[in-house]
Amino acid sequence: MVSPDLIRNMVGIVGNIISFGLFLSPVPTFYRIIKNKDVQDFKADPYLATLLNCMLWVFYGLPIVHPNSILVVTINGIGLIIEAVYLTIFFLFSDKKNKKKMGVVLATEALFMAAVVLGVLLGAHTHQRRSLIVGILCAIFGTIMYSSPLTIMSQVVKTKSVEYMPLLLSVVSFLNGLCWTSYALIRLDIFITIPNGLGVLFALMQLILYAIYYRTTPKKQDKNLELPTVAPVAKDTSIVTPVSKDDDVVDGGNASHVTINITIEP
């Protein structure tokens, strides 16, 4: 009979692969930002929340806090690096208002993590106690991470457009939450179960919204506009063009037409 630990590890490896795909799913969004040199209506909220979430889970999975959690550490360590790259790009192409907001949030997150690490290592002296404290924080901020797309979901409902809610991100979020919820239920870990269970719910809501508003999303206009065809003008040609009698005065009186003589040198 296959042991639960083996099954759990296998599910965890699959979860690592799916989570890696989740971390990479915004790449088209950031390619678009770099190409346009503008963040447009994209929000930094999900990436700021994910950054803090990754930092907390890396700390949670360390041997000094929660032993035998290497799968938690590996994927969140990778995610931490990827999110840092995303936020750097977002910062570079944001306006001053967004840059200031991001700076405040990032500084707050750094101070918060420093306080958590020092508080746990100096104030809690057993793995059980450290796991409890950090696990509660992970559950809280993991829930915030998964709920951060709610701001984008509200925008979808308001604009009836899914342009700024990538389908790939929603699909991978659903699969990721489903996998890690299963992982946590094999050997019950309530701190992993809560945020990922909610992640499944929120991702499902996004997929439903996508199905509802996909057809009402405005199509992008073709930037390659066709210019009107201009017939060649012959040498010494006179062109008669209508003129609004209320707008133009010719020789002190109103004129309905103006004759323009064009001479083309050979």
Swiss-Prot record:
Gene3D superfamilies in alphabetical order:
1.20.1280.290
Q: What is its main location?
A: membrane
Q: Which segments constitute the MtN3/slv domain?
A: 10-97, 133-216
Topological domains on the Extracellular side lie at 1-9, 67-69, 123-131, 187-189
Q: Keywords assigned by UniProt?
A: Cell membrane, Membrane, Repeat, Sugar transport, Transmembrane, Transmembrane helix, Transport
Regarding the membrane, this protein is recorded as: Multi-pass membrane protein
Q: Which domain of life is it from?
A: Eukaryota
Query: Where in or outside the cell?
Result: Cell membrane
The chain's Cytoplasmic topological domains, given as residue ranges, are: 31-45, 91-101, 153-165, 211-266
UniProt cross-references to InterPro entries, sorted A to Z = SWEET, SWEET_rpt
Q: Where are the transmembrane segments?
A: 10-30, 46-66, 70-90, 102-122, 132-152, 166-186, 190-210
MF terms from GO for this chain are: sugar transmembrane transporter activity
Q: Which GO terms describe its cellular component?
A: plasma membrane
**Keyword Ribonucleoprotein recorded:** no
Is Membrane set as a keyword in this record?
Answer: yes
Q: Which family does it belong to?
A: Belongs to the SWEET sugar transporter family.
User: Main role?
Assistant: Mediates both low-affinity uptake and efflux of sugar across the plasma membrane.
How this chain assembles, per its entry, is: Forms homooligomers and/or heterooligomers.
Protein name as catalogued: Bidirectional sugar transporter SWEET7b
The protein's organism comes out as Oryza sativa subsp. indica
